[in-house]
């Protein structure tokens, strides 16, 4: 049978004793009034429940008196004591610590007793007690020594603990000091408004808090408490504070937008308000006026854009828009200088105008491709002259290649051959394309392809011969000039 509460003992809540003790210490001050209001709010509901449920819970007793009994363990008997503590005996004259008794903690009456507060709570109380809500480190030391004489004779390591809490704890942050203030070295420290409620909860958990004004005092620091009235922003959320501004995580926005693009519209219609829609967060303008959602196009517009891009890539070279770059799907044809010149020349030539205006049939493409292949060995001008004969084209090609051998080799020798191949790949669809790969290999290529390859090989050999001749001429002239210089010197 467990211990029974003696009849002389009456259940007494710890909060009422705390408020009575602090009201005696701080009589007539704002601390006692604020604490009394806080206690009235906290303990009014439990008192009502005790009064209403007194008849129902007659067998249940309040256990707040158990920690006041010094001989509690001895009342269980020696066997229980041996099982609980076989080595250490309980001392009858051990004074209860102020953190575990109903007597209020008074630093003046018990100067040698360590206060039941963590260093973060001490720093919090010191900063909140200042009128500007900002203090340097030395003023925090002085406040702790003034209100808690225990630290006057304590080892000096407590100052290091204060500094470590200021620098490592996220609840405290540095504030730039004003020019008018003369605090010497160091910077000012204040409470981060995001973590102020956490410090208040930690201080409430301590049994005796001598400064309850921090629970009801509104913040007065304009720089440190600008967003206290706003919603709490927790660490790791999509919105985080940096230099007093709300920012949005771009990685999360991109991921949400991609997920939404893959979501069918039927599921999107069932999204409640506040959920990501159209790739952007639906935010309340009153809470976050500075944050704007990212403009993401709807799914239908995105699909139309994709179709437009594919159609632009599949456009044949006989229908380029005037002044627009040629979009090619072949990476080997990514040469801006050759494609731009050829597109401009085709847009101005009568043949290209007639072909682009007419219906783009396979025969038109084939005629245009054969004409372009006959003049494929043309120079750096790159224009297709469909009304000239092949002999005139070869003479012009020789003239231009002698003037600009590098451009002719780069433009007509490389780009034109790939263009001709692309024309045949796009314009002509041989019936053998639908056959399997093995049957394609057994069939013979058409004669037109052989002729085209022969012409291409001939033009390349012709250009290579011109190039070699030019190299020989330049080498001979260079040797002759060197010999003349040597003879003149001798």
Swiss-Prot record:
State where the protein is found: Nucleus
Asked whether the UniProt record includes 4Fe-4S among its keywords, one would answer no
Q: Which Gene Ontology terms of cellular component type are present? A: chromatin; nucleus
| Source organism | Homo sapiens (Human)
- Positions of region (Disordered): 1-21, 86-108, 315-458
Q: From start to end residue, where is composition biased (Basic residues)?
A: 417-429
Q: Matching InterPro entries, A to Z? A: FH_FOXN3, Fork_head_dom, FOXN2/3-like, TF_fork_head_CS_1, TF_fork_head_CS_2, WH-like_DNA-bd_sf, WH_DNA-bd_sf
Keyword Repeat assigned to the entry: answer is no
Recite the UniProt keywords alphabetically: Cell cycle, DNA-binding, Nucleus, Phosphoprotein, Repressor, Transcription, Transcription regulation
Matching entries from PROSITE patterns are given as:
FORK_HEAD_1, FORK_HEAD_2, FORK_HEAD_3
The protein's superkingdom reads Eukaryota
Gene Ontology molecular function, alphabetical: cis-regulatory region sequence-specific DNA binding; DNA-binding transcription factor activity; DNA-binding transcription factor activity, RNA polymerase II-specific
Protein's gene:
FOXN3
Q: In which residue ranges is the amino acid composition biased (Basic and acidic residues)?
A: 384-409
**Subunit organization:** Interacts through its C-terminus with the C-terminus of SNW1/SKIP.
Q: What is this protein called?
A: Forkhead box protein N3
A biological process from GO: regulation of DNA-templated transcription
